Structures are given as structure tokens and as C-alpha cells.
């Protein structure tokens, strides 16, 4: 994704154009997301091969979603994208709907995966993967339960349904406050990196 973005921007510049991969370049149009697909399985050497760990991985990402948001969505423009044009607003999951933070497509077997829909091109993919792996491993270790799916379109859902759902932070300041209130970033990112994202 990083190489692709660089190549497109270079080719555009050579032709007198500008390629914008920011989260929300046009206020009335869909923004740019950087969906991350996650898969998980025990190896044969673990003695637990065949056990389905994807639900635990999803549970961990949901549990730590708010704390990860300032790194997955590090610019003010990131938050203009949330809640419109199929970008998530709530911390929820479903196999059936693209308005969720995490969608589990209908693939099976080796192709089964969870699609995290909140990250955008402003994020550092290496830090994003670090946090997602850490959240998944934490959840597997602690046995976090997977919440029930929210199998409806959250853009048109009634207020009584959405009132019970946790929301993604609504601004960069809110995201930083959520991260400071928790301990997750302190556990998985070095202090200088943390300070950069939370200052």
C-alpha cells in the first residue's frame, strides 16, 4: 500500500496532477480508507491446530479499538470520514454489513478473515500491524469473549439500537484522550513513538 501510494503520487506529479490519499479529501464524497484484513490460526506445533482463534482476534481488536485510534487515524481529517460513506462510527462487528468497524466476509477455510475498516492512509502500517497483533494475542491469552454481532446497517439503525454501542472517538483529541486513559499504547509502543502520537 505504501509503495503503491508513492508510485501513484510520483506518476501523477510527472503528469501535472496531484493524487490525494488523505482520509477525506472532498467533504461531500467518500474518503480513502486503508482496510486491513486479519487472519489467525494456531500452527501444527502449538498442539491446538484446528481451533478457531479468529473470534478471539476480533474480540481483542474491538476491546482495544478506541485506544488504537490515534495511531490508526492520526490526522484531523481522519475523523471527518467516520460515520459516512461506509466508514464505521461504532465499535461493532458483523458478517453481513459494511457499516461495522469489523466485517467478516463470507470466505471460508484458509481465506477466512476479518476486515478492519477504520484505518486510513495517514496511518503507519507497521505500527498498525504491531498493535493489531498485540491486541489479538492479548485477547487469546485472556480469553476475551466476542460480543454479539450487530447485523444491521448502522447508518439507518434506530437510536435505541445505536445508543447501546460504544463509538469510535469523534476527533483526534478524543482519540488521544482514550489512548491516555488506557494502558495499551504503553504496552506495545516505545515511549518516543507514543509521545509523538499523543502530544
Give the positions of each predicted feature.
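Helix-rich catalytic cores of soluble enzyme domains
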Residues: 1-26, 30-39
Amino acid at each position: 500500500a505504501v509503495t503503491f501510494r508513492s508510485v501513484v503520487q510520483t506518476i501523477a506529479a510527472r503528469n501535472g496532477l496531484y493524487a490525494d490519499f488523505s482520509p477525506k479529501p472532498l467533504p461531500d464524497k467518500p474518503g480513502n480508507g486503508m482496510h486491513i484484513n486479519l487472519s489467525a490460526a494456531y500452527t501444527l506445533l502449538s498442539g491446538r491446530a484446528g481451533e478457531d482463534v479468529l473470534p478471539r482476534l476480533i474480540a481483542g481488536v474491538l476491546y482495544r479499538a478506541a485506544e488504537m485510534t490515534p495511531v490508526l487515524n492520526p490526522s484531523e481529517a481522519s475523523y471527518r470520514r467516520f460515520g459516512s460513506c461506509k466508514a464505521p462510527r461504532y465499535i461493532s462487528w458483523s458478517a453481513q454489513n459494511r457499516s461495522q468497524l469489523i466485517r467478516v466476509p463470507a470466505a471460508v477455510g484458509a481465506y477466512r478473515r476479518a476486515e478492519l475498516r477504520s484505518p486510513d492512509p495517514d496511518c503507519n502500517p507497521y505500527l498498525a500491524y504491531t498493535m493489531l497483533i498485540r491486541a489479538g494475542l492479548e485477547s487469546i491469552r485472556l480469553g476475551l469473549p466476542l460480543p454479539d454481532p450487530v447485523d444491521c446497517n448502522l447508518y439507518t439503525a434506530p437510536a435505541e439500537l445505536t445508543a447501546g454501542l460504544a463509538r469510535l472517538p469523534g476527533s483526534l483529541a478524543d482519540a488521544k484522550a482514550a489512548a491516555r486513559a488506557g494502558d495499551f499504547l504503553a504496552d506495545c509502543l516505545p515511549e518516543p513513538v507514543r509521545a509523538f502520537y499523543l502530544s
